[in-house]
Design a protein with these regions (language model features):
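Amphipathic, Lys/Arg-enriched alpha-helical "gate/interface" segment within cytosolic domains
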Residues: 2-126
Length: 126
């Protein structure tokens, strides 16, 4: 699994490599979950290239299945993508907006935004 563990004084997360696939197929999400749990890390940062080919096409149902699995195991995922420029299906941006409100997945443009989201979430748990 090509995920890097980032450890900061008050924050830990796993991050996928830029411009490299991590999830080749839908079932690979189980490997990410296993790796996250093995590292005792509930925060995950992924880039579009890390996701399955159909993730940004809602008709594939891949986004829903992946996010549901992560949610079931208590893993918070930040997806680093600019939805104003990255190609996606017609209603994907609406789904991303709703996911951002739920608190388990956050679509944002930078890793710094993801770190801030993780920090807010971790602070709310204390």
């Amino acid at each position: 699994m090509e995920l890097l563990l980032v450890e900061k004084p008050t924050l830990r997360y796993l991050i996928g490599p830029q411009q490299q696939p991590v999830l080749q197929k839908l079932s690979d999400i189980s490997l990410i979950i296993e790796y996250s749990l093995g590292e005792s890390c509930e925060n995950l940062v992924l880039y579009p290239e890390n996701l399955t080919p159909g993730f940004f096409d809602l008709s594939s149902r891949e986004a829903g299945e992946i996010l549901t699995k992560l949610r079931q195991y208590g893993i918070h995922a930040a997806i680093i993508v600019d939805l104003t420029t990255y190609p996606h299906s017609q209603y994907f941006a609406e789904m991303a907006y709703e996911e951002n409100k739920r608190g388990f997945c956050y679509f944002c443009a930078t890793v710094a935004e993801a770190e801030a989201w993780f920090a807010r979430h971790d602070a709310a748990k204390r």
